[in-house]
């Protein structure tokens, strides 16, 4: 959502970067980058406000993991693209403790590490929420207590 975030993603090893704010039709850009094959996997954080572009960007038989709903909880699902691309849309939420431990163990097997943007003390919880709502973060916002 900003050139600064794109620069940080590039520093982490990203090959292709698209600012969805300056390129609202980013699904077509993904198609161009991939030679009109589409992306294998899309991590969809925006929710209904960006979901249609995720369907434009995903390849036939691809996977869209809905892991965030920054633009709201309800909205239009482009069923014609879901069906014609035979794509899979999966909603994901943080599960119970065992699932989280399994997830952390799987992450530990990978070379990449989660990016922690900022850590707040529990007493500053309102500040953490304001920071989240600002959209200025790149990576995770953590609260210690």
Regions found by a protein language model. Name each.
Residues 16, 40-41, 62-63, 140-141:
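Structural motif
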Residues 13-18, 33-35, 81-84, 106-110, ...:
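Short, hinge-like loop/turn segments at secondary-structure boundaries
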Residues 29, 33, 57, 106, ...:
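CheY-like receiver
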Residues 36, 111-115, 127-145:
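C-terminal capping/lid region of NAD(P)-dependent oxidoreductase domains
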Residues 1-53:
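Adenosine-nucleotide cofactor-binding segment
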Residues 3, 9, 45-115, 119-122, ...:
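Glycine-rich phosphate-binding loop and adjacent beta-alpha segment
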């Amino acid at each position: 959502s900003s050139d600064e975030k794109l620069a940080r993603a590039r520093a982490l090893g990203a090959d292709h970067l698209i600012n969805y704010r300056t390129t609202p039709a980013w699904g077509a850009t993904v198609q161009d980058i991939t030679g009109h094959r589409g992306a294998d996997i899309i991590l969809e954080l925006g929710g209904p406000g960006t979901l249609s572009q995720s369907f434009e960007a995903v390849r036939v038989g691809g996977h869209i993991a809905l892991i965030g709903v920054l633009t709201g909880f309800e909205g239009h699902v482009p069923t014609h693209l879901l069906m014609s691309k035979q794509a899979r849309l999966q909603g994901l939420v943080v599960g119970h403790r065992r699932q989280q431990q399994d997830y952390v163990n799987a992450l530990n097997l990978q070379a990449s590490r989660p990016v922690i943007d900022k850590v707040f003390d529990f007493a500053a919880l309102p500040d953490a929420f304001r920071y989240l709502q600002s959209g200025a973060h790149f990576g995770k916002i953590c609260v210690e207590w």
